[in-house]
C-alpha cells in the first residue's frame, strides 16, 4: 500500500516499539493540551483581575475561580506539569530515535549480507556506506521530527483552533484556512526539494566511492604516481557535492518564506477581528489576550513545520534509496534441506549440464559435465577468462547456473541438488578459498577462528603447519595474538595465502576448492603445501581425518604435477579432461596453454624440472 511512499512506509518501523510509542504519544498529547490550557488560563486570570479592580482580590477564597490568584496558581501548576511531561516526552522520543536508527542499520547490514555476490559487483562500497550512515541518519531525524512537528503540531492546531472557535467561530475557522493554504504550498515545494536532495545524495555517494577506492587502492596510486590526479578528482567530487547542497539550500531559502508569510497572516486576522469583537462587546480583554497567544503559537508551530519540511524532503529521498536496497530479492535463494552427511566417508560433487549465460546471451559456462571425487586433487586449467573461477563459484552457490544442476553426496549417502540445501549447510561442506585474501582487523588467532570459533591454539598451529606457515608464526612477536592489521596489511602476498589456506584447513570441510590460492607462493613452499593437502585427500592415509575432495584453479605446473585429474576449459566449455600424461599426448590445446609447443619435449620430465 505504501510502497510508493517510502517515508510513510518507514513509519512501519514503529511497530518494533509499540508500548514506548503509545507512551510517547500520550506524553506529547498531555504536553500540548497543557499549552492551550495555560493560555486559556491566562485569559481567565486577566478577566477576573479586571473584575476585581473595584474589589479586593482577597474577597474570594483562593479555590474560588472568581479569584485571580486561583488562575495564577492553575497557570503555575500547568506550567510545572508541562515542563515535566515535555522532558519525559523528549527523552522517550530520543530513545525511539536511537532505536529506529539501530533497527535501520541492522536491516541494511543484514540485507547487504544476504544479497548475492552479483549484486555487490554492481554496487560500490560508497553506496552501501551512504545508505547505512547518511541516509539512515536523515530518516531517523525525520521520524523523530514526525513526533516533534507533525504529531505535536497537529495537536496544537486542533486544540488551539477549537478554543478560538469557542470564543467565536470565525476567530478559529479563518486561521485554519490560512494554515491549509500555507501547508499546501509547502507540500508542493517539498516535491522539488526531494529531487534536489536526490542529486545531493548521488554526489555524496561519489565522495564515498572515491574515498573507499583511494584508500583500498593506495598502493596502485603510489605505484603509478596518481596522487595529484586522484586528489583533483576527489576535489571535483567535493565541489560538486557542495554545489548540489547549495542549490537545495538556496531553493528553500527563496521559496519557503512565501507560505510562512501566508500563515503569519492568521495572527493579523486574530488581532484585527478580535479587536472588532471587543468593540461590539462579544469578546473580553482576557479572551483577546489568550487568542493572541494561541495565534502566536500557531504561527510559530506551522513555521517550524515549514522549516522541518526540508528535513522531510531529504528523508523522502533517503528513505527511497534505503527501501530500494531493502526490497531487492537475492538471486540466490536459501534451500530448506540440512543433510546429515558423514564427512568421514567423503563427499562428491556431480556437475550435470551446467551453463551460465549473461543477460546479453553470452555463455560464461556451457554444458559442463564432470565429477569431483574424494581422495583426488582435481585441477582446472585454461586461459584467462576461460571460466575457471566462475565454475568454482557455482559449487557453493555464489552463482546459480542458468541451466543444469550440481549434486552433492555419494552413492552410499545419497544425492542432493545443491539448490535445495540451506546455504549455511552447503558452505559447511564446500569451502572455497577465493583469490582475494581478506582478513578482518584483529589478531591472527581471531582471523583463524573465523573458520572454527572454538579452535584451540594447538589446532591453529597444526593448520598453520599444514599450510607451511608455522615459520611465520614463529617470527611474529606475539604469536597467535599478533594483530595483523586491517585486511592483513602487515603481511606479504605469500603470507596472506598461507594463512588463508590454514583457515580453510582448520574448517576441515570435506570439499576444498582453491581459486588460484597458491599463486604468490614460491615453488618449494607450494610443493610442500600441495603435498600435505594431497596426503589429507588420500583415502588410504588420511586416518581419522576427513577425506578431502580438493579442486584447484591453477595453470602452474607445480600444481599440475600433483594433480590426479585435470579439467581443461576454453571459452566456458570443457575441451579435454584426464591425467597430465594423457592430456600431453592427446590434447594440442592443453600442450599450448602449458607452454609445451615442441612435440619432442618430454612432458613428464619438463613438469618436474619446473618444481
Where are these regions (language model features)?
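Juxtamembrane loop-to-helix connectors within ABC transporter transmembrane domains
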Residues: 5-6, 14, 93-94, 113-158
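Transmembrane helices of ABC transporter permease
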Residues: 16, 20-30, 145-199, 270-283
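Alpha-helical segments in transporter systems
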Residues: 19-44, 71, 75, 90-93, ...
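Transmembrane helix-loop-helix hairpins at lipid-water interfaces of multipass membrane proteins
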Residues: 21-85, 165-170, 281-285, 411
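Hydrophobic alpha-helical segments in the permease module
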Residues: 71-82, 86, 179-183, 187, ...
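Loop segments that connect adjacent transmembrane helices in multi-pass transporters
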Residues: 123-126, 199-247, 337
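Cytosolic ends of transmembrane helices, especially the final helix of ABC transmembrane type-1 domains
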Residues: 203, 207, 222-226, 250, ...
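ABC-type nucleotide-binding domain
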Residues: 342-611
Amino acid at each position: 500500500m505504501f510502497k510508493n511512499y517510502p517515508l510513510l512506509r518507514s513509519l512501519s518501523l514503529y511497530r518494533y516499539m509499540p508500548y514506548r510509542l503509545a507512551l510517547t504519544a500520550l506524553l506529547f498529547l498531555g504536553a500540548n493540551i497543557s499549552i492551550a490550557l495555560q493560555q486559556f488560563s491566562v485569559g481567565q486570570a486577566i478577566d477576573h483581575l479586571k473584575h476585581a479592580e473595584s474589589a479586593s482580590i482577597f474577597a474570594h477564597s483562593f479555590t474560588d475561580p472568581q479569584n485571580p490568584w486561583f488562575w495564577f496558581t492553575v497557570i503555575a501548576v500547568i506550567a510545572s506539569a508541562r515542563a515535566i511531561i515535555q522532558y519525559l516526552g523528549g527523552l522517550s522520543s530520543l530513545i525511539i530515535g536511537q532505536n529506529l536508527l539501530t533497527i535501520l542499520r541492522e536491516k541494511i547490514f543484514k540485507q547487504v549480507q544476504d544479497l548475492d555476490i552479483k549484486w555487490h559487483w554492481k554496487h560500490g562500497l560508497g553506496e552501501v556506506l551512504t545508505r547505512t550512515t547518511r541516509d539512515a541518519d536523515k530518516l531517523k531525524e525525520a521520524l523523530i521530527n514526525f513526533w516533534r512537528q507533525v504529531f505535536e503540531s497537529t495537536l496544537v492546531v486542533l486544540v488551539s483552533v477549537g478554543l478560538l472557535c469557542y470564543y467565536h467561530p470565525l476567530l478559529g475557522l479563518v486561521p485554519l484556512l490560512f494554515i491549509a493554504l500555507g501547508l499546501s504550498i509547502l507540500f508542493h515545494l517539498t516535491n522539488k526539494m526531494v529531487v534536489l536532495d536526490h542529486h545531493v545524495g548521488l554526489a555524496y555517494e561519489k565522495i564515498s566511492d572515491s574515498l573507499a577506492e583511494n584508500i583500498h587502492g593506495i598502493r596502485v596510486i603510489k605505484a603509478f604516481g596518481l596522487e595529484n590526479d586522484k586528489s583533483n578528482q576527489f576535489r571535483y567530487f567535493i565541489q560538486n557535492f557542495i554545489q548540489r547542497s547549495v542549490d537545495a539550500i538556496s531553493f528553500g531559502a527563496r521559496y519557503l518564506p512565501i507560505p510562512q508569510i501566508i500563515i503569519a497572516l492568521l495572527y493579523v486576522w486574530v488581532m484585527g477581528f478580535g479587536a472588532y469583537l471587543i468593540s461590539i462587546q462579544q469578546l473580553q480583554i482576557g479572551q483577546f489576550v489568550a487568542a493572541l497567544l494561541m495565534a502566536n503559537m500557531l504561527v510559530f508551530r506551522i513555521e517550524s513545520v515549514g522549516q522541518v519540511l526540508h528535513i522531510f524532503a531529504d528523508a523522502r529521498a533517503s528513505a527511497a534509496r534505503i527501501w530500494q536496497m531493502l526490497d531487492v530479492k537475492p538471486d540466490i535463494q536459501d534451500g530448506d534441506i540440512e543433510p546429515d552427511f558423514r564427512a568421514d566417508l567423503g563427499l562428491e560433487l556431480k556437475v550435470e549440464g551446467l551453463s551460465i549465460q549473461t543477460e546479453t546471451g553470452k555463455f560464461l559456462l556451457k554444458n559442463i559435465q564432470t565429477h569431483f571425487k574424494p581422495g583426488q586433487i582435481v585441477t582446472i586449467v585454461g586461459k584467462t577468462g576461460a571460466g575457471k573461477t566462475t565454475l568454482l563459484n557455482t559449487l557453493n552457490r555464489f552463482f546459480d547456473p542458468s541451466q543444469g544442476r550440481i549434486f552433492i553426496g555419494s552413492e552410499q549417502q545419497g544425492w542432493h541438488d545443491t539448490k535445495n540445501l540451506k546455504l549455511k549447510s552447503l558452505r559447511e561442506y564446500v569451502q572455497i578459498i577465493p583469490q582475494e585474501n581478506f582478513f578482518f582487523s584483529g589478531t591472527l588467532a581471531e582471523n583463524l577462528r573465523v573458520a572454527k570459533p572454538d579452535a584451540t591454539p594447538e589446532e591453529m598451529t597444526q593448520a598453520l603447519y599444514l599450510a607451511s606457515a608455522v615459520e611465520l608464526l614463529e617470527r611474529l612477536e606475539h604469536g597467535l595474538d599478533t594483530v595483523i592489521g586491517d585486511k592483513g596489511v602487515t603481511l606479504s602476498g605469500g603470507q596472506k595465502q598461507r594463512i588463508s589456506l590454514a583457515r580453510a584447513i582448520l574448517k576441515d570441510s570435506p570439499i576444498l576448492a582453491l581459486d588460484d590460492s597458491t599463486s604468490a607462493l614460491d615453488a618449494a613452499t607450494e610443493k610442500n603445501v600441495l603435498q600435505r593437502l594431497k596426503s589429507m585427500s588420500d583415502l588410504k592415509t588420511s586416518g581419522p581425518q576427513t577425506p578431502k575432495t580438493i579442486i584447484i584453479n591453477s595453470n602452474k605446473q607445480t600444481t599440475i604435477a600433483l594433480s590426479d585429474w585435470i579439467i581443461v576449459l576454453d571459452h566456458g566449455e570443457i575441451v579435454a579432461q584426464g591425467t597430465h600424461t594423457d592430456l600431453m599426448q592427446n590434447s594440442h590445446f592443453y600442450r599450448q596453454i602449458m607452454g609445451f609447443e615442441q612435440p619432442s619435449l618430454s612432458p613428464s620430465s619438463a613438469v618436474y624440472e619446473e618444481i
